[in-house]
Amino acid sequence: MTLYQIKPLFQSLLRPTMFWLHKRQVSANQITLAALALSLLTALLLALVPYPGMFLLLPIVLFIRMALNALDGMMARECNQQTRLGAILNETGDVISDIALYLPFLFLPESNASLVILMLFCTILTEFCGLLAQTINGIRSYAGPFGKSDRALIFGLWGLAIAIYPQWMQWNNLLWGIASILLLWTAINRCRSVLLMSAER
């Protein structure tokens, strides 16, 4: 069970906004680039001012980014805007945004840089394995337990927690370690889904 499974409900809530944007000539690629720009600007701010209170921004930005990611996909599919460029922007933008938004954790007190870098590497590996499924079987794998939406929820909540209770940063490395294990588990599950689908064929 992952948050990805409630995506249809989230999309239905966003559909009126999608039509409003479409009527104003906003394209899916523009929404994708807006999400990337928001992530990079937030990451730069958090890196330059690595004060725990600033991480209150993280859950807000992650939620907005999640909404923008849903909107660009919906608009591409439902408004006939699917392009190869859009697919490239979507996949690269997701990975760059993830790295950018979670990299500032490295600058927090009590954070082990090696663990944060390992976690980011595992994040990239997880997305690569999801794309690998699409390359082999034609269907992208979103297997959990620690997909993009799940990461946004956990790290957003952690940003909120350390903003309110800075002393909780003593548990930073425990979270990075657990996250890395969950990401590796997710990568393995996505590779398994490739093999299972291939076997069924």
Model-derived regions, located:
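Hydrophobic alpha-helical transmembrane segments
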Residues: 1-60, 100-201
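Glycine-rich active-site/cofactor-binding loop and its immediate structural neighborhood
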Residues: 55-87
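Active-site His/Glu-centered metal-binding helix of metallohydrolases
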Residues: 67-75, 88, 92-96, 125-128, ...
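Basic, amphipathic juxtamembrane/active-site segments
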Residues: 74-114
